[in-house]
Amino acid sequence: MQHAASAIIAPEVGFLPAYWQFHEEVTRAQLRAWLPTGRHTLVDVSGPRGPGAELAAEAGHTVLRVIDGVPPGRGLEDPSSDGGSLNGRGLDGRGLEDRGSDGRGELDGSTRRDRHGQIIRLVADSSRLQFLNDGCADAVIAEDRALSVHLAAEILIAEIARVLRPAGRVLACVDSLVLGMAVLADQHHWAHLVDVPHAEVVLVPWPDGSITRCYGPDQVRELFSGAGLTVKWIRPRTVFSESMVTHCLQREPDSLPKLVRAELAAAADESLGAQLVISASKPRTRPH
């Protein structure tokens, strides 16, 4: 029997089924549409499947990709002598702070240059960004369930707000209450299911033994506003059902681009869908 959690996790296979090809293309299209114009400094704290760093670098941005992990007890290092932008003091001379030998983060030695931008990878605790200076990022990407996997999301969102410059933006994707309730129903946790509408924080056990934090629109707004961020919009990652997408692609295998455009143009209740995508910004500094 297919578990409800499979609605947001692509199968580990060499060739993605039709629906997951659609899901991936929608994710990429939403990210491309959100990315700022020009060249900027971005921080990506997304989960491992998030394509944000790759797409941002292709668009000309410099991206610090924070890879979640517990680094050895060494400080930040110069990544290499290949022209990477880290010099021990900053991301492009301004963003990444050397915290000494306290083990806050470790460069993994890789600086990937795209045709226009670059990705600098750092192994660190992505929920605590002490290695970044205040206001160093023009935008932050927290895709691939970052604020659901980190259960103490208040810590992560506060760190995101701190590193954003005034008027900087954040794009995030979280697991929704709709998904959480479906997972609880699959597991026959009826008592917990009854409590979901009244709970301030909804933590749902996952089939693999992990726990995810699920959100409704009101909880998303409360989380972001608590960190001083203003939510601009909330929308489902996808509105179209897996059965509908699969049926359409079986009938017309070349209709994927058309389906993606239709998905992006579709009006949707912000509480629908297995995942919610959020765009928010940090207020501009008021003149004294």
Residues covered by each model-derived region:
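Class I SAM-dependent methyltransferase SAM/SAH-binding core
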Residues: 43, 48-78, 103-129
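A short SAM/SAH-binding and catalytic strip from SAM-dependent methyltransferases
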Residues: 138-153
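A short acidic, Gly/Pro-enriched loop at the edge of an enzyme's catalytic core
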Residues: 130-140
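A short glycine-rich, Lys/Arg-flanked "PGG" loop and its adjoining helix->strand segment in the class I
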Residues: 154-169
